[in-house]
Amino acid sequence: MSAYCGKYKDELIKNAAYIGTPGKGILAADESTGTIGKRFASINVENVEENRRSLRELLFTTPGALQHLSGVILFEETLYQKTKDGKPFVDVLKEGGVLPGIKVDKGTVEVAGTNKETTTQGHDDLGKRCAKYYEAGARFAKWRAVLKIGPNEPSQLSIDLNAQGLARYAIICQENGLVPIVEPEILVDGSHDIERCAYVTEKVLAACYKALNEHHVLLEGSLLKPNMVTPGSESKKVSPQLIAEYTVRALQRTVPAAVPAIVFLSGGQSEEEATVNLNAMNKLSTKKPWALSFSFGRALQQSTLKAWGGKTENVVKAQKAFITRCKANSEATLGTYQGDAVLGEGASESLHVKDYKY
């Protein structure tokens, strides 16, 4: 049997290509209730549904922001929320030319017999949930697998389990009309150098595409959300140019040209760092058969959160910070970012959280 060729085939290909439109990218606004609670705690805002809804309304209704986005990943709660005027968020996004997406994994669990390595859960009722989310207006999905670099990590067992898990998720999504974003995140935690990260990234991506192929996933109707290839968090920083070279080379060696776009996660980099590194990749004159774009959460929201602080009177100021980051990242997808964005408070601070849970 070849790749998926069911009733959603053409729609999947069209939507995946649209998400990869040059000049656009993805806002990851799918933080779980627990994760957004930690963000709110940093700005002294109570973690209740109305505050979560208010933040997301602030983001989705920022004048001019949606033109820089092709997709927004939502948490299940947000998929069904509305603006204070009663308009469903899904409609706000669609009218702004943005595809709604949905986080479908149910978090990680430790793999017995390993050194605290994890696999991702959520397959059991996935088909049913995907059908329900499609009905509610979602057109793509996200599933995060987490791997770590250590003296003996990632183990082959962890690589295989996570690659198989991502592939199973991807084909179930496609059978239900959702473009799967395949996210094998290799955490930045550790003191490893950039060469070690490149080696592990290539190994993990090769395993993922082997598994995707074995599960008959339609690559043209899928997207990849990888980490950038960088030194570990306890290692000396390197230039954006070096990060760009190592990252693009790892992708050239492992990601088939059939994949329409690669949307990077920010992995705890500061807002500005993530943008500058993406820009450096798009400036490289080498073979890049896929669009290179962004799927940023923290790196699109940090200065916005700081400016907002949970106060209605700060909404306009916060939206200004948000549009600044959207525009900067839009330019980075074209390799035209000049590093001239007005940096809001928090734009330069590292957003790294050890052993990050989403």
Curated annotation (Swiss-Prot):
Top-level class of the enzyme under EC nomenclature: lyase
**Record's InterPro entries?**
Aldolase_I_AS, Aldolase_TIM, FBA_I
The enzyme's E.C. designation? 4.1.2.13
What's an example Gene Ontology biological process for this entry?
fructose 1,6-bisphosphate metabolic process
Q: What is its main location?
A: cytoplasm
Q: Where in the cell is it found?
A: Cytoplasm, Cytosol
Instruction: Indicate yes or no for the key word Lyase.
Output: yes
NCBIfam families xrefs: FrucBisAld_I (NF033379)
Name of the featured protein: Fructose-bisphosphate aldolase 3, cytoplasmic
Organism the protein comes from = Oryza sativa subsp. japonica (Rice)
